[in-house]
Design a protein with these regions (language model features):
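Terminal amphipathic alpha-helical/low-complexity segments used for targeting or macromolecular assembly
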Residues: 1-51, 56, 186, 192, ...
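ABC ATPase A-loop
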Residues: 47, 59, 77, 95, ...
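Fold-independent oxyanion-binding glycine-rich loops
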Residues: 50-51, 62, 69, 86, ...
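Glycine-rich beta-solenoid repeat tracts in large extracellular/virion proteins
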Residues: 52-53, 71-72, 89-90, 107-109, ...
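Short loop/turn microsegments at loop-to-beta-strand junctions
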Residues: 55-56, 61, 74, 108, ...
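Glycine-rich active-site/cofactor-binding loop and its immediate structural neighborhood
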Residues: 56, 60-93, 99
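Conserved mixed alpha/beta catalytic, RNA-binding, or beta-rich assembly cores of soluble enzyme
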Residues: 85-86, 91-92, 97-99, 103-105, ...
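Glycine-rich hexapeptide-repeat left-handed beta-helix
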Residues: 110-220
Length: 220
């Protein structure tokens, strides 16, 4: 699936231009360090509450709020008007777009979240790219190799390509999405699903269907 097929919604012009350079998801992952190439020091334009831990080169945009018990480790970028909740941890190599909500006790590791992404409490995201308006439910795990290794599904030498969610994709509560998974725009992975592979746009995947998919109209 092409990058242009996954991400087409409104986003910051500079980010839109940057994304259009890449034909494949693999190329996008390889180039992600370019986002932080010019980030050398802390640039705090938003509100960082007392008690928050900000380490290294971190940019926090205007109108953003970082809860007093959150942790952000640079290099990392947080866009404008974004909220980082209590006990959330943003680890080095992460890009959080504007108007995002990162809930209580979430972990974001070396991932790129575009604008208006909602990550609910307790979710874990590693080496992943989340499109505009996507939603990750409470307790969901994206690209968590530790879980997959415990099930014997990946090796220690697996690549650092995690999960890609297209614009407006949804991952339900307590679902686990395996590394290398691509979820098309407007596709829904229901609660408690163990998902892997490539899912075309406008699909619905539920636990009851045992990972079978069915077409879903764009208006439903």
């Amino acid at each position: 699936m092409k990058v242009s097929d996954l991400f087409s919604a409104e986003m910051e012009p500079d980010l839109n231009d940057w994304l259009r350079k890449f034909a494949s998801v693999g190329d996008l992952f390889s180039a992600m360090p370019q986002l932080y190439a010019n980030l050398r020091a802390q640039n705090i334009q938003g509100i960082v509450e007392d008690g928050a831990v900000i380490v290294g080169a971190v940019h926090i945009g205007m109108g953003s709020v970082v809860h007093g018990r959150a942790i952000i480790r640079g290099p990392a970028i947080v866009g404008n008007n974004t909220f980082i909740g209590s006990h959330a941890e943003i680890r080095a190599g992460s890009f959080i777009g504007s108007k995002c909500v990162i809930g209580h006790s979430c972990s974001i590791v070396e991932s790129m979240l575009m604008s208006s992404v909602n990550v609910c409490s307790g979710a874990f995201i590693r080496n992943s790219v989340l499109g505009f308006g996507s939603v990750v439910g409470p307790g969901a795990a994206l690209g968590a190799e530790e879980v997959e290794r415990s099930l014997g599904l990946v090796s220690e030498t697996s690549s650092k390509i995690g999960v890609v969610l297209g614009d407006y994709a949804v991952v339900g509560a307590n679902s686990s999405v395996k590394p290398g998974t691509i979820v098309g725009s407007c596709t829904i992975l229901g609660e408690g699903v163990l998902a892997g592979g490539t899912y075309e746009p406008n699909q619905t995947v539920t636990l009851r269907q045992a990972l079978e998919t069915k077409p879903r109209s764009s208006g439903s």
